[in-house]
């Protein structure tokens, strides 16, 4: 049975909150990998984008970057084989955060070594000395933070960056000789990620989410919600039909987004913790579970 229009809109709001991190992560990936390899601040898929200075007020890729660590980022696609990340020995804080396609922190690499970042179902052999790290989604965002004491310390950070390696397992086992493929630049993929997502129609948004869920499976904890949302065709591989939304859908969609901005900001504030003059976001940050409004 098709639910009535009011029930549909309640589900649409729930589904939007649920899928927003997935769709926004994909838009961020599309922008960040939109390069032929020559653009500052971007790199093709499975390749490093090493920052050469600290983030400042002009930094726009993500909110609230650190200002005492230099970032080395890479967008990984491990759908066909694991990627090997080699983290060198360093004399300072340097760790790798692995974010999945839903913005959960799947793993943190904080010791020197070679790590094979793999999907749980991958069944190949790893060479000696390579540590397997299972992650839940084919799209992963690796964010490496290397601390520095000031601009005069930058050459030391560059030396660490040069020793980092990222290459497919098949290239690693053949001795590490690897020429990364050249990327491609498309003008239509030059956008501000959050603006791109907010400008999507209902069909664009939910069908993007449905396609992404096929390669970046939802967590087991999401099963109950997805069972409910299947009534409006939101879920891996489904096709969302905007006809469900009834008349005046475009206007109502705009109103819904405006309303969500206010309520989600208030909901997010509930997780804020004060420490003297500092504000930070507490649990379950990084492993959000079913706290979909966080």
Protein language model annotation of sequence segments:
Residues 2-294:
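A compositional/structural signature for long, glycine/proline-rich flexible linkers
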């Amino acid at each position: 049975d098709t639910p009535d229009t009011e029930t549909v809109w309640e589900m649409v709001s729930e589904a939007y909150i649920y899928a927003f991190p997935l769709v926004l992560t994909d838009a961020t990936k599309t922008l960040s990998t939109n390069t032929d390899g020559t653009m500052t601040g971007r790199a093709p898929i499975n390749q490093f984008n090493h920052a050469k200075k600290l983030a400042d007020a002009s930094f726009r890729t993500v909110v609230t970057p650190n200002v005492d660590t230099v970032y080395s980022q890479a967008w990984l696609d491990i759908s066909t084989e694991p990627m090997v990340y080699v983290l060198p020995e360093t004399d300072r804080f340097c760790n790798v955060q692995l974010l999945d396609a839903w913005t959960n922190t799947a793993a943190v690499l904080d010791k020197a070594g070679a790590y094979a970042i793999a999907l749980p179902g991958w069944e190949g052999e790893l060479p000696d000395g390579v540590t397997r790290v299972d992650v839940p989604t084919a799209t992963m965002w690796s964010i490496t933070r290397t601390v520095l004491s000031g601009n005069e310390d930058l050459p030391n950070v560059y030396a660490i960056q040069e020793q980092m390696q990222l290459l497919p397992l098949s290239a690693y086992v053949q001795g590490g000789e690897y020429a990364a493929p050249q990327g491609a630049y498309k003008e239509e993929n030059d956008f501000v990620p959050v603006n791109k997502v907010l400008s999507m129609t209902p069909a664009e948004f939910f069908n993007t989410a449905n396609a992404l869920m096929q390669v970046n499976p939802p967590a087991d904890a999401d099963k109950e919600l997805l069972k409910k949302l299947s009534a409006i065709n939101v879920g891996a591989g489904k096709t969302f039909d905007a006809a469900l939304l009834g008349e005046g859908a475009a206007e109502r969609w705009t109103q819904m987004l405006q309303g969500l901005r206010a309520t989600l900001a208030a909901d997010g504030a509930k997780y804020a913790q004060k420490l003297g003059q500092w504000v930070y976001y507490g649990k379950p940050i990084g492993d959000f579970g079913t706290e979909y409004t966080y």
